[in-house]
C-alpha cells in the first residue's frame, strides 16, 4: 500500500511539474522607443503599427510588429519610409491601418503641419501588411487646419453598414470625415457637411472609436504627451456622430509602474467580450519625452457597458490565440 501511495505522489509531482504557467507578454511588448500604437487583427495575427519615437527630423519611417499570441513578436522594419512618400520631410506619426479586398491602407500624419501646404494626413497602400506601403496620392488627403484641428492622429473606423469614417485632430479639436469608396478621398455626409467637429470636453489628441454591440465608444488622449499627466478618457453614444459626453478616465499613470499612459488602440480577441488595449507609456525614470514604449493590458466593461479603469502592469497579458 505504501508503495502505491508513493507512486501516486510521484505521478502527481510529475504532472504538476509538467504544467507550465501561462506565458505572459510582459510590458513593454518589444524593445525600442515606440509610441502611438495602432493595433489591428488580420486573420489570426495581431499587427501593431507604432510611431518611431525619436526627434521629429529623424521620424522618416515606421516599423511594424506582428504576433499570433500577443507574446512572441516579429519585427518588420520600415514598412513605410520617406523613399515612398515624396512629400515627407519629418514627423511621420500615428498610423491607422485597414484592409479591404486584399489591399492594405495605411493612413499617416506627416511634417507636423501648422500651415496649409506643409503636410498633413496622407494614405499609402500595399498588398501585404508588412508593406512596403507607397503613397497612393502623391499629396496629403487633408492638408489644412479645419475647425481648429491639426491634421494628425487619424483613426479609420468601418461601421456595420460598410461606411468608413476617419476621426482625426490635434490641438484640442477633433473632426470626423467620411471616406469615399476608394478609401482615398473624402465625401460629404448626407447633410452636406464635409468636416464635422465632434470635440468632447477635455479632448487633446489620439481619437479612437470602438463599436461593441450597438454602442459606440469614442476614446481620446488628454494632457501633454511628453509628461506624466497624459491619459485616456472616453464617451459613449448610440451613433458614430455623437454627441460625445465625457464619462471618465480609463487609462493613466501608476507611480509604481510607469507614467504618461496614453495614445491607444483596442483590439478584440476570440472571446465574446475579450478586448485588449494597446498603448504607450514612459518608463519610470525616463528623462526624454520621446522615451516611450508600447504596452498591452486587458480591457473590461461593467454590467452597464461602461469601461472599467485599466490597471497598467509589467506583466501584460497571457498568451492567447487570435
Language-model features and meaning:
Residues 17-322:
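Carbohydrate-active catalytic/glycan-binding domains of CAZyme proteins
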